[in-house]
Amino acid sequence: YNNTKILDRINWRVMAGEKWVLAGGNGSGKTSLLNMIFGDNPRAYKCRIRLFGRQKGSGESIWDIKNRVGFVSPEMHQYLPAGQSVNDVLCSGFYTSEGLYNKPTSYQRILSKKWLQLILLGHLSDLPFNVLASSHQRMVLVLRALIKNPPLLIFDEPFQGLDPENIAVMKNLLNSIAEHTNCTMIFVSHFDDEVPASFNRLLTLNKGKVVSSE
């Protein structure tokens, strides 16, 4: 961008079922890399990026990609329409939409409530999402990423603003999913103690370059 390299010669191969931590300080390129993978950045189509065994930009739409990826970021709650219930927000995850514009099935409604019960928030199901504490909003958005059981999950600082008790609840959930599914998972955090134990691969960036991969 403007003659500045944001990402420089990144070579990263993520195999199905692997659990990766993406590390690096502010400005290291983590978010830019995730945007190249998941977002609709036009520069991504000029790079050698393969998703699910296929060159990005070889005919698939951005929705084809998003339907196979569960994603959560610290900013996501800002893009959701006000007034929709917690259950609505969770059900929107089935449709990869920012807000619920389809009519969910009874099964989807029930499944959404069961996910909330897993993290002890079942009593919040019918409340407007925007009245929740920010920590509870972030927990719900993690569930939204999980709910459609996608082959790839990307968590960009998912525990930002959570207290230690809620972090422990969410770590236990992600560990359970990592251990019992073949879902590929990428986790970004500035804090090592937030990383679920089952994430055993590490890519570290600094100034847009890979400094270690293990």
What residues fall within each predicted segment?
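Conserved structural motif at the start of ABC-family nucleotide-binding domains
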Residues: 6-9
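The feature captures the beta-strand-to-loop junction immediately N-terminal to the Walker
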Residues: 23-25
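Helix-to-loop junction immediately C-terminal to a conserved catalytic motif
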Residues: 38-39
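ABC ATPase NBD Q-loop/coupling interface
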Residues: 48-64
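ABC-family P-loop ATPase nucleotide-binding domains
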Residues: 74-131, 137
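Hydrophobic anchor residue at the start of the ABC signature
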Residues: 142
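A short, proline-enriched helix->beta-strand linker immediately N-terminal to the Walker B motif
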Residues: 147-151
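Catalytic Walker B motif of ABC-type/P-loop ATPase nucleotide-binding domains
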Residues: 153-157
